[in-house]
């Protein structure tokens, strides 16, 4: 017998930083880890959320709402949205992209499931809840760029730099976010398509990032430095690609401003 379920996005997550974040979720009788696996009873739930009732298998229901909860927990732990690169897509769908709709689908042989991108994983690595320490967690890194440059190399963009910081740094992440049609700016609801590219910080405090999967259009690079205490420092660069050729005029002005401060 079909079961009617009315549900309205029973989860919400937001992280101000590595020290402050929230995640709310609501439980119910149809949600369980076992519900992510094949259902021998083939239960169908008639689910109403933003539209009229539509049929969900028990597995799909748990994928969407447990996956959604974990996605929102990621926000509570200060993870932003991101999208799998072409190479990463072999692993499935990025959890902090649309991975809430694919979570544990591989258990039912319905797809590749979801995964944490390298960028998300490295940010969690130093989050106080995972590192097990709050030492210096409230201290400000006071990051400075001693060198910063960006340029195109064939079908990729290379970002290089040298930094210094009062809190040790472990990695630099470039969120490459294209401005979509009818999009205003690069606000949180418009960043699901931001691919991420990571460089560890060398012993000489240098980084070297190569961004691929280039597309025509206006772009924002959010250059995020990850510090050992869980903190992040963000700088923004903007560029345009037209017919495969990148224009860094605005980015170079922004680099000059970043380097001067």
Question: What residues fall within each predicted segment?
Answer:
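Active-site-proximal segment of zinc-dependent metalloprotease catalytic domains
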Residues: 1-77, 81-83
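Intrinsically disordered, low-complexity N-terminal regions enriched in serine/proline/glycine
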Residues: 7, 185, 191, 238-240
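Compositionally biased regions
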Residues: 7-10, 166, 260
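Serine/threonine-rich low-complexity intrinsically disordered regions
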Residues: 27, 39, 118, 193, ...
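Extended interaction regions within the primary functional domain
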Residues: 28-30, 34, 180, 188-190, ...
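General N-terminal targeting signals
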Residues: 40-42, 113, 238
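Short beta-strand elements
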Residues: 229-261
């Amino acid at each position: 017998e079909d079961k009617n379920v009315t549900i309205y996005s029973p989860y919400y997550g937001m992280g101000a930083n590595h020290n402050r974040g929230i995640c709310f979720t609501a439980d119910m009788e149809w949600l369980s880890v076992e519900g992510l696996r094949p259902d021998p009873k083939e239960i169908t739930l008639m689910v109403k959320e933003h539209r009229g009732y539509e049929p969900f298998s028990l597995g799909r229901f748990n994928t969407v709402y447990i996956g959604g909860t974990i996605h929102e927990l990621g926000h509570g732990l200060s993870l932003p949205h991101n999208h799998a690169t072409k190479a990463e897509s072999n692993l499935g769908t990025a959890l902090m992209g649309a991975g809430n709709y694919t979570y544990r689908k591989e258990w039912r042989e319905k797809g590749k499931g979801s995964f944490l991108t390298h960028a998300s994983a490295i940010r969690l690595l130093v989050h106080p809840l995972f590192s097990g320490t709050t030492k210096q967690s409230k201290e400000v890194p006071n990051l400075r760029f001693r060198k910063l440059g960006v340029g195109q190399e064939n079908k990729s963009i290379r970002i290089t730099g040298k930094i210094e910081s009062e809190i040790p740094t472990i990695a630099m992440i470039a969120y490459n976010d294209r401005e979509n049609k009818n999009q205003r700016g690069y606000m949180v609801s418009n960043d699901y398509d931001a691919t991420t590219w990571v460089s560890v910080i060398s012993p000489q405090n240098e980084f070297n990032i190569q961004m691929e999967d280039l597309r025509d259009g206006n772009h924002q690079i959010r250059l995020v430095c990850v510090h050992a205490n869980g903190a992040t420092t963000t700088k923004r660069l903007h560029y345009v690609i037209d017919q495969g050729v990148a224009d860094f005029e605005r980015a170079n002005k922004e680099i000059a401003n970043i380097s001067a401060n």
